[in-house]
């Protein structure tokens, strides 16, 4: 077996997947190279071609298959891996006693929203122990913005007897810096929640491989 392939695998077993570079992770996924190109070289070529791991994971079938060394089989495997990750995060949130750890909500929102090509506004509804009741993509917009109606969020929260909410939306541009309208919306949502006794936990803006948390900003 190709030693170049084994090196990332051995590194993963010794130090965990988080110790691997994007190139090494992709090499494990690809398993083998192509004629005249070892798998580590191929994985770097693929990353260079797409610009980032995120762009690779977000590519449609036609774009994906235009890259040398990639085909329909790899595309199917990648989509299945992405979906398993989403479901794992959702199930983690369902079985945990609460969502007191901010990173868990962030990871779930990133998995759901990072690859969206238009703005999507999503809400997590929690009970009084911060356990997830449900999560829902409530508003869809254009590449620049999504129109959000606080009253609809409150109506849904009351309908499912939520004691708290966490909201998030993505910036398709990749820049997670909140706009003035994002800040204004956050204030409106906080006020609307306060009026009906629902706790507003956080508003998270999802970018490319990064995020902004209004709650975390208070402690900076």
From Swiss-Prot:
A motif (JAMM motif) lies at residues 169-182. Zn(2+) binds at residues 169, 171, 182. Keywords: Hydrolase, Metal-binding, Metalloprotease, Protease, Zinc. GO terms for biological process: proteolysis. Residues 98-220 form the MPN domain. InterPro entries: MPN (IPR037518), RadC_JAB (IPR025657), RuvA_2-like (IPR010994), UPF0758 (IPR001405), UPF0758_CS (IPR020891), UPF0758_N (IPR046778). The keyword Chloroplast does not apply. It comes from the Bacteria. GO terms for molecular function: metal ion binding; metallopeptidase activity. Transmembrane segments: none annotated. It holds the Pfam family UPF0758_N. PROSITE patterns: MPN, UPF0758. Belongs to the UPF0758 family. This is UPF0758 protein APL_1970.
């Amino acid at each position: 077996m190709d030693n170049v392939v084994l090196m990332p695998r051995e590194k993963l077993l010794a130090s965990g997947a988080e110790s691997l570079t994007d190139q090494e992770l992709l090499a494990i996924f690809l398993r083998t190279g192509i004629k005249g190109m070892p798998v580590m070289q191929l994985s770097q070529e693929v990353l260079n071609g797409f610009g980032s791991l995120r762009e690779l994971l977000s590519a449609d079938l036609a774009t994906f298959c235009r890259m040398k060394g990639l085909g329909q089989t790899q595309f199917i495997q990648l989509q299945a891996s992405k979906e398993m990750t989403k479901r794992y995060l959702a199930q983690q949130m369902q079985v945990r006693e609460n969502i007191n750890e901010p990173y868990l909500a962030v990871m779930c929102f990133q998995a759901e929203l990072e690859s969206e090509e238009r703005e999507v506004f999503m809400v997590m509804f929690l009970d009084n122990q911060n356990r997830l009741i449900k999560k829902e993509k409530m508003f869809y917009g254009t590449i620049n913005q999504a129109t959000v109606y606080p009253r609809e969020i409150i109506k849904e929260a009351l309908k499912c007897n939520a004691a708290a909410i966490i909201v998030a939306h993505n910036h398709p541009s990749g820049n997670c810096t909140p706009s003035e309208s994002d800040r204004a919306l956050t204030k409106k949502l906080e006020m609307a929640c306060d009026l009906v006794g629902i706790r507003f936990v956080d508003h998270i803006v999802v970018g490319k491989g990064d995020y902004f948390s209004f709650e975390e900003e208070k402690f900076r």
